[in-house]
Design a protein with these regions (language model features):
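Glycine-/small-residue-rich active-site loops that bind phosphorylated ligands and cofactors
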Residues: 2-3, 26, 114
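A structured beta-alpha segment of the ubiquitous adenosine-cofactor-binding alpha/beta core
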Residues: 10, 25-48
Length: 173
C-alpha cells in the first residue's frame, strides 16, 4: 500500500517468464478500500495475504461467507535466541538481520534473548554492530540502512521501543 514497487516488479517478472494470465494477479491499494472489496468479492476464489494479525482476521471474516481459500502469514516477527555455545558471529548476524529492509520485514527479529553467561558480551557486540551500521537515503546504492516508509511507521516504532523499555528490555544503541 505504501511501497508497491517491489510487488509490481515481481508481477512484471512473472509476466516476462510466461506465467499464464490470471494465475497471479496484483492489486495495489489500502486494506480498507481495496482489501475489503477484494476479499469479499464473489468472483475471488482465493486470497493470499502477508501482514498484520488484525488485517488477517478481517480477511478471514470476509472470506468465510463464500468459503474462499485463504493463506495468511501474520505477525511473524520473532526473537533471536543466543546460547552460550553459539557461534561468535550469531549476535552480529542477528542484529544485521533485524535491520534487513529497514526492519520492515515480517520475518525480521525484534528482540534478542541471550543466555546470562554471555549476556554482557552479546550486548557489547550488538551495540557495536548497530552503531557501525551506516544510514543513508534509500535510493543510494551500497550497504546501509535506509529510512522507514512513513512518519506514521516511524512513530509506531518509537511506541514499540518505549513499550519494550517499559517492560525492562535493554535498548543497547
Amino acid at each position: 500500500e505504501l511501497a508497491p514497487l517491489d510487488s509490481m516488479i515481481f508481477a512484471e517478472m512473472l509476466e516476462e517468464a510466461g506465467c499464464p494470465a490470471g494465475v497471479f494477479n496484483l492489486v495495489n491499494g489500502d486494506g480498507i478500500g481495496v482489501g475489503s472489496q477484494l476479499t469479499s468479492h464473489p468472483d475471488v476464489d482465493m486470497v493470499s495475504f502477508t501482514g498484520s494479525t488484525r488485517a488477517g482476521a478481517l480477511i478471514s471474516h470476509n472470506a468465510a461467507d463464500d468459503f474462499k481459500r485463504v493463506g495468511l502469514e501474520l505477525g511473524g516477527k520473532g526473537a533471536n535466541i543466543i546460547f552460550a555455545d553459539a557461534d561468535e558471529k550469531a549476535v552480529k548476524r542477528g542484529v544485521r538481520h533485524c535491520f534487513n529492509n529497514t526492519g520492515q520485514s515480517c520475518n525480521a527479529p525484534t528482540r534478542m534473548l541471550v543466555e546470562r553467561s554471555v549476556y554482557d558480551q552479546a550486548v557489547a557486540i550488538a551495540k557495536e554492530t548497530a552503531i557501525s551500521t551506516n544510514t543513508d537515503i534509500a535510493s543510494k546504492s551500497g550497504k546501509h540502512l535506509g529510512p522507514v516508509v512513513s512518519q506514521l511507521q516511524f512513530d509506531k516504532i518509537q511506541v514499540l521501543i518505549q513499550a519494550g523499555i517499559d517492560e525492562n528490555a535493554t535498548l543497547v544503541a
